Amino acid sequence: EMMKGMEAVDASLYNLLVYVDDASREGSQSYKFPTLYRLSKDKNGNVVKETVKEYKEQVSTDPAVMQEVLKRAFTEYPAESYGLVLWSHGEGWIPNPLPLAKQASTRWVGEDTTGGTTYLNISDIAAILSEFPRFDFILFDACFGQTVEVAYELRNCTDYVIGSPTEIPGPGAPYESVVPAMFKGTNVGVEIGKAYYEPYEKLYTGVSPSMTWTGGVAISVIDCAALDELASVTKQTIAKNELNVGEIYNYDLRSKYSKNYVGYYDMKQLMERLSSDVTAWTSAADTAIVY
C-alpha cells in the first residue's frame, strides 16, 4: 500500500523512510532482520524499495534503537519539514508497567517480542523526539493512539497528533491514500485524518467485527498549539470535583472483564458530568480537535 501511495508523490522532492521489524522469528522462511528502507522511484518512474540499513537483531522498542534510527534518518535525509508514523500495537496513556496494585498494559505504542515482550512508553518517545526538529505531524497507526494525555505529552514535539481513541481495524491505515496526504503542503494533519478515515467510511455498514472491515474506524486530529489552553480550562473544572467513572463511556470494553486494563473514558462526557457549564471547555476542545 505504501508503494502504491508513493506513485502519487514526487520522489525527487520528498523522502519516505520505512523502518520494519516484523514479528516473524529468526530462522523462519519469512524472517528478515530489522531494516530501514527508502521508497523512491527509478528512472522510469516506477516505485522501488531500497535498503538504507539492515540491522542485526535488536529490540526495536528500546529507546536507544529508536533514537539511532531517527538520527540516521535526519542525518542522511535532511529536509525542510518532517512527519512521523508509529505503527504497531498500542495501549494508550498509562505507562507499562503501571507501578500500582492494579497492573495495566497501557501508555505505550510498539511491541517487540524479541526475547520476551517489551513496549515503548509515550514518555520515552517524548524524550527521544525532543532531541530532533519538531515534526509537522505524528500519526499513531495503532489502537488507542489518540488520547488527550498522549497528545499533551507530545505537544512540544509535533504540530499535530493523528490517531484513534479506540481499537483500529486490522489492516490499519490505508496507506494508498495516506501516503500522498503525508506530503501535502498545507493543512497536513487534517489531510492525513481524512485520508485515513474516508476509505473506511466507504466500506461502513455498521456490522462489526467483520473481516471485510465494515465496522468503521474512529480518527481525530489534535492541534498541539491549543493543548495548553485546553489543559488550563480542564484543570479549573476537575480540581473541585470527583466522579464515578463507571458513569462515563468507556472506549475499551476489555476493562469490563479484565483487571489488566483500566479503560479509556470519553473526556467530553466526563466534563459535562463534572460541570453544568462547559462553554469555556467546549470552546477550548473545539479549537484543539481540528478533525
Regions found by a protein language model. Name each.
Residues E1-V85, G90, I94-A126, E247-Y291:
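Divalent cation-coordinating acidic motifs and surrounding scaffolds
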Residues P99-Y291:
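Terminal, contiguous helix-loop blocks that mediate binding/assembly
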